[in-house]
UniProtKB/Swiss-Prot annotation:
Oligomer and partners: Interacts with nop5. Component of box C/D small ribonucleoprotein (sRNP) particles that contain rpl7ae, FlpA and nop5, plus a guide RNA.
Keywords noted in UniProt: Methyltransferase, RNA-binding, rRNA processing, Transferase, tRNA processing
Gene: flpA
One Pfam family named in its UniProt record: Fibrillarin
Protein's name in the database: Fibrillarin-like rRNA/tRNA 2'-O-methyltransferase
Stored PANTHER family: FIBRILLARIN, RRNA 2-O-METHYLTRANSFERASE FIBRILLARIN
Length: 193
Protein backbone atom coordinates (compact mmCIF):
# COMPACT_ATOMS: atom_id res chain seq x y z
CA UNK A 1 0.00 0.00 0.00
CA UNK A 2 1.32 3.49 -0.83
CA UNK A 3 2.59 5.66 2.02
CA UNK A 4 1.28 9.22 2.40
CA UNK A 5 3.22 12.04 4.06
CA UNK A 6 1.77 15.54 4.27
CA UNK A 7 4.34 18.20 3.33
CA UNK A 8 2.06 21.19 3.89
CA UNK A 9 -1.66 21.87 3.76
CA UNK A 10 -3.00 20.10 0.67
CA UNK A 11 0.43 18.94 -0.55
CA UNK A 12 1.63 15.36 -0.08
CA UNK A 13 4.45 12.99 -0.79
CA UNK A 14 3.06 9.66 -1.97
CA UNK A 15 5.44 6.72 -2.01
CA UNK A 16 4.44 3.86 -4.31
CA UNK A 17 7.55 2.44 -5.98
CA UNK A 18 9.09 5.94 -5.64
CA UNK A 19 8.37 9.22 -3.84
CA UNK A 20 6.07 11.51 -5.79
CA UNK A 21 4.83 15.00 -5.06
CA UNK A 22 1.01 14.91 -5.10
CA UNK A 23 -2.21 16.75 -4.37
CA UNK A 24 -5.58 15.34 -3.36
CA UNK A 25 -7.65 15.23 -6.57
CA UNK A 26 -10.59 17.66 -6.48
CA UNK A 27 -11.93 16.03 -9.68
CA UNK A 28 -11.65 12.26 -9.00
CA UNK A 29 -10.98 10.02 -11.96
CA UNK A 30 -9.80 12.88 -14.16
CA UNK A 31 -6.25 13.76 -15.19
CA UNK A 32 -5.17 17.15 -16.53
CA UNK A 33 -1.82 16.58 -18.26
CA UNK A 34 -1.18 12.83 -18.18
CA UNK A 35 -0.23 12.65 -14.49
CA UNK A 36 -0.70 9.43 -12.52
CA UNK A 37 -3.63 8.92 -10.18
CA UNK A 38 -2.96 6.98 -6.97
CA UNK A 39 -5.82 5.76 -4.76
CA UNK A 40 -5.22 5.28 -1.05
CA UNK A 41 -8.01 4.38 1.39
CA UNK A 42 -10.74 6.05 -0.64
CA UNK A 43 -8.74 9.19 -1.49
CA UNK A 44 -7.29 9.88 -4.92
CA UNK A 45 -3.99 11.71 -5.31
CA UNK A 46 -2.66 13.31 -8.50
CA UNK A 47 1.09 13.22 -8.99
CA UNK A 48 2.63 16.65 -9.50
CA UNK A 49 5.61 16.86 -11.84
CA UNK A 50 7.97 19.57 -10.51
CA UNK A 51 9.72 19.67 -13.90
CA UNK A 52 6.48 21.04 -15.39
CA UNK A 53 5.58 23.40 -12.55
CA UNK A 54 7.64 26.13 -10.93
CA UNK A 55 5.39 26.00 -7.88
CA UNK A 56 5.94 22.23 -7.65
CA UNK A 57 9.70 22.81 -7.85
CA UNK A 58 9.40 25.34 -5.01
CA UNK A 59 7.74 22.66 -2.86
CA UNK A 60 10.61 20.24 -3.53
CA UNK A 61 13.10 22.98 -2.62
CA UNK A 62 11.27 23.28 0.71
CA UNK A 63 9.89 26.78 0.18
CA UNK A 64 7.02 27.65 2.48
CA UNK A 65 3.97 27.58 0.20
CA UNK A 66 1.32 29.88 1.72
CA UNK A 67 -1.71 28.11 0.25
CA UNK A 68 -4.51 26.98 2.57
CA UNK A 69 -7.76 25.11 1.95
CA UNK A 70 -9.78 28.36 1.86
CA UNK A 71 -7.19 30.65 0.21
CA UNK A 72 -8.17 33.05 -2.54
CA UNK A 73 -5.48 33.02 -5.24
CA UNK A 74 -4.78 35.19 -8.27
CA UNK A 75 -2.77 33.15 -10.76
CA UNK A 76 -1.19 35.26 -13.52
CA UNK A 77 -0.09 33.26 -16.57
CA UNK A 78 -2.40 30.27 -16.25
CA UNK A 79 -1.52 28.81 -19.68
CA UNK A 80 -3.40 25.52 -20.14
CA UNK A 81 -3.75 24.97 -16.39
CA UNK A 82 -1.15 22.39 -15.38
CA UNK A 83 -0.10 24.16 -12.17
CA UNK A 84 -3.47 25.87 -11.70
CA UNK A 85 -5.07 22.42 -11.42
CA UNK A 86 -2.83 21.56 -8.46
CA UNK A 87 -3.49 24.95 -6.84
CA UNK A 88 -7.20 24.17 -7.27
CA UNK A 89 -6.69 20.86 -5.45
CA UNK A 90 -4.88 22.60 -2.58
CA UNK A 91 -7.35 25.48 -2.15
CA UNK A 92 -10.35 23.16 -2.44
CA UNK A 93 -12.65 25.53 -0.52
CA UNK A 94 -11.12 28.73 -1.90
CA UNK A 95 -10.86 30.27 -5.34
CA UNK A 96 -8.27 30.46 -8.13
CA UNK A 97 -8.72 33.51 -10.36
CA UNK A 98 -6.69 32.46 -13.39
CA UNK A 99 -5.56 35.12 -15.86
CA UNK A 100 -4.26 34.08 -19.29
CA UNK A 101 -3.60 36.31 -22.30
CA UNK A 102 -3.36 33.71 -25.10
CA UNK A 103 -6.73 32.66 -26.58
CA UNK A 104 -5.34 29.25 -27.65
CA UNK A 105 -4.18 28.40 -24.11
CA UNK A 106 -7.44 29.70 -22.68
CA UNK A 107 -9.43 27.46 -25.02
CA UNK A 108 -7.65 24.42 -23.56
CA UNK A 109 -7.97 25.79 -20.03
CA UNK A 110 -11.76 26.30 -20.22
CA UNK A 111 -12.35 22.52 -20.23
CA UNK A 112 -10.45 22.14 -16.98
CA UNK A 113 -12.16 25.14 -15.38
CA UNK A 114 -15.61 23.82 -16.31
CA UNK A 115 -15.00 20.71 -14.16
CA UNK A 116 -13.70 22.56 -11.09
CA UNK A 117 -15.94 24.83 -9.05
CA UNK A 118 -13.09 26.92 -7.67
CA UNK A 119 -11.34 27.95 -10.91
CA UNK A 120 -12.38 31.22 -12.54
CA UNK A 121 -10.76 31.62 -15.99
CA UNK A 122 -10.09 35.19 -17.14
CA UNK A 123 -8.93 35.97 -20.69
CA UNK A 124 -7.02 39.21 -20.14
CA UNK A 125 -3.65 40.94 -20.11
CA UNK A 126 -2.11 40.55 -16.63
CA UNK A 127 -0.51 43.95 -17.14
CA UNK A 128 -3.95 45.58 -17.05
CA UNK A 129 -5.47 44.52 -13.71
CA UNK A 130 -8.25 47.09 -13.93
CA UNK A 131 -9.67 45.14 -16.89
CA UNK A 132 -10.56 42.22 -14.58
CA UNK A 133 -11.05 44.09 -11.30
CA UNK A 134 -14.81 43.51 -11.55
CA UNK A 135 -14.21 39.73 -11.34
CA UNK A 136 -11.37 39.32 -8.83
CA UNK A 137 -11.88 39.85 -5.10
CA UNK A 138 -9.03 40.64 -2.69
CA UNK A 139 -6.70 37.63 -2.58
CA UNK A 140 -4.40 35.95 -0.05
CA UNK A 141 -1.81 34.86 -2.63
CA UNK A 142 -0.71 36.03 -6.05
CA UNK A 143 1.37 33.61 -8.12
CA UNK A 144 2.87 35.14 -11.24
CA UNK A 145 4.18 33.02 -14.10
CA UNK A 146 4.13 35.41 -17.07
CA UNK A 147 6.77 35.78 -19.77
CA UNK A 148 6.92 39.56 -20.14
CA UNK A 149 9.89 41.95 -19.99
CA UNK A 150 8.12 43.96 -17.25
CA UNK A 151 7.26 40.99 -15.01
CA UNK A 152 8.04 42.72 -11.72
CA UNK A 153 5.97 45.77 -12.69
CA UNK A 154 3.01 43.53 -13.61
CA UNK A 155 3.31 41.74 -10.26
CA UNK A 156 3.45 45.04 -8.37
CA UNK A 157 0.38 46.42 -10.18
CA UNK A 158 -1.65 43.33 -9.35
CA UNK A 159 -0.43 43.26 -5.75
CA UNK A 160 -1.46 46.88 -5.19
CA UNK A 161 -4.87 46.20 -6.75
CA UNK A 162 -5.74 42.77 -5.28
CA UNK A 163 -3.38 41.51 -2.55
CA UNK A 164 -4.76 41.55 1.00
CA UNK A 165 -2.70 43.06 3.80
CA UNK A 166 -0.26 40.34 4.95
CA UNK A 167 -0.85 38.47 1.67
CA UNK A 168 1.88 36.71 -0.33
CA UNK A 169 3.30 37.39 -3.78
CA UNK A 170 5.14 34.48 -5.42
CA UNK A 171 6.97 35.82 -8.46
CA UNK A 172 8.54 33.49 -10.99
CA UNK A 173 11.12 35.60 -12.82
CA UNK A 174 11.84 34.44 -16.36
CA UNK A 175 15.20 36.06 -17.03
CA UNK A 176 15.30 35.33 -20.77
CA UNK A 177 11.96 37.12 -21.24
CA UNK A 178 13.52 40.26 -19.79
CA UNK A 179 16.91 40.19 -21.54
CA UNK A 180 18.34 37.39 -23.66
CA UNK A 181 21.94 38.59 -23.35
CA UNK A 182 22.31 39.68 -19.72
CA UNK A 183 23.37 37.38 -16.89
CA UNK A 184 20.30 35.80 -15.23
CA UNK A 185 21.83 36.52 -11.78
CA UNK A 186 22.03 40.23 -12.61
CA UNK A 187 18.47 40.22 -13.93
CA UNK A 188 17.17 38.52 -10.77
CA UNK A 189 19.00 41.02 -8.57
CA UNK A 190 17.59 43.95 -10.54
CA UNK A 191 14.01 42.61 -10.63
CA UNK A 192 13.90 41.99 -6.89
CA UNK A 193 14.68 45.69 -6.31
Amino acid sequence: MPEIRQLSEGIFEVTKDKKQLSTLNLDPGKVVYGEKLISVEGDEYRTWDPRRSKLGAMVLKKFDIPLKRNSKVLYLGAASGTTVSHVSDIVSEGAVYSVEFAPRSMRDFIGLASRRKNIFPILADAGKPDSYAHIVEPVDVIFQDVAQPNQAEIAARNAVRFLKKDGYLLLSIKARSIDTAASPKEIFKEEVK
